[in-house]
Amino acid sequence: WRDGTYEASESSFSHGYKNYVRIVVENGYIVDAHFDAIPEEGEKMKYLASVLGDYGMTANSDAQAEWYVQADRAAAKLLEMQDPAKILGSGGEVDAISGVSVTIAPHFQLAQKALSGKRR
């Protein structure tokens, strides 16, 4: 990958948020990935709201971990694999990632969009 910081977000909101990714590439490698969601109303991004306990995923559902924890696990998978295409299936789906039960495929699709045309 070409060095740089790359971002992408969905064009429209769904359930009050639109997904967003930021990817940092250094020396040709993905060294940081941040999966988040921009709120339609309010100030807090979904990641921050989750960290602060305002998103309440485990309190309000049978989720195994808060949203930010699952987002970090998914982002770690991208750092491990170094290519969103290696994680996304041919139909745009994501196989199970240990400890992630939220729908995460849109973030990997956005990662692919952010990195489009950035190969060395």
Regions found by a protein language model. Give the residues of each.
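Active-site- and interface-proximal helix/loop "cap" or "latch" segments in soluble metabolic
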Residues: 1, 9-120
